[in-house]
Amino acid sequence: MLSALYYLLLVLLCTLFMILSALALVVCYPFDRGRRTVHELSRILVRIFFFLPPFWRQRVIGRELIDRKKSYVIVINHNTVIDIPALYYIPLNFRWVSKREVFKTPFFGQFLLLHGDICIDRGHGAEALEQLVRDGKKWISRGASVAIFPEGTRSKDGEIHRFKAGAFTLAKEAGAEILPVVLDGTKTLIKKNLAFNWGNRITVRVLPPVPAERVAALETHELMQEVHERMCTALGEVRNEKLKVKDQK
């Protein structure tokens, strides 16, 4: 019952913030081509979502590694839809890359459109990569970062699986740094019966960026492997630390 009421509250909040985002887009567009205002409204909505349940906890590690003046290609491990709001805890203006089907989701799809996120058709690989690079470079040139799930789909077992080349190709083409981010705890926030886990803990760990010079120097497959190994190691460290804290209790 409590979960149902919270879902209803979220629908009302999303409706309100969708209207505010549409107004902000119209009013601010002439001097805010990077849609920073719309992004900040999304961050406020996310903070309300995570703040209201009193026993939810979110921890961000490595925030100091981010240079807010830079544009990054952000790569994140993917477990569930909750990964998307969780990333809004990092202090960057970014655009998501998402498959076409997600843009058709009620409320969520409209938010993606207002936010200016990048829509790709995974059924057409070459065209999807071309659009990713074209639109990604456009947003990076406007001062925004681009966030991508390099696995291309959700992990069923919570582990980080093989990466696809899109994010790394974009970073090379745009001359951008790669910012790896590891998420843990998002998979357990919503139970299989769609009820919320009211005692959930989420960790967002930011890893040191891969400099643009190294991005350019490495072959794409080498870059993918390096970032994959770093993210797997970091995820293991986050989970081991969580187990130690649990044992101490």
Can you say where each PLM-predicted feature lies in the sequence?
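Generic preference for hydrophobic
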Residues: V60, I74, W96, V204-V206
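Catalytic core of membrane glycerolipid acyltransferases/transacylases, capturing the structured
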Residues: S21-E40, L52-P53, R68-G125
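Non-catalytic C-terminal accessory region of glycerolipid acyltransferases
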Residues: E130-K249
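Thr-Gly-centered strand-to-loop micro-motif
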Residues: I61, V97-K99, I120-R122, P150, ...
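Glycine-rich helix-loop-beta junction characteristic of Rossmann-like nucleotide cofactor-binding loops
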Residues: G62-D67
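N-terminal membrane-anchoring alpha-helices
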Residues: M1-R57
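Short gly/ser/thr-rich secondary-structure transition/capping motifs
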Residues: P53-I61, L129-E130, T186-T188
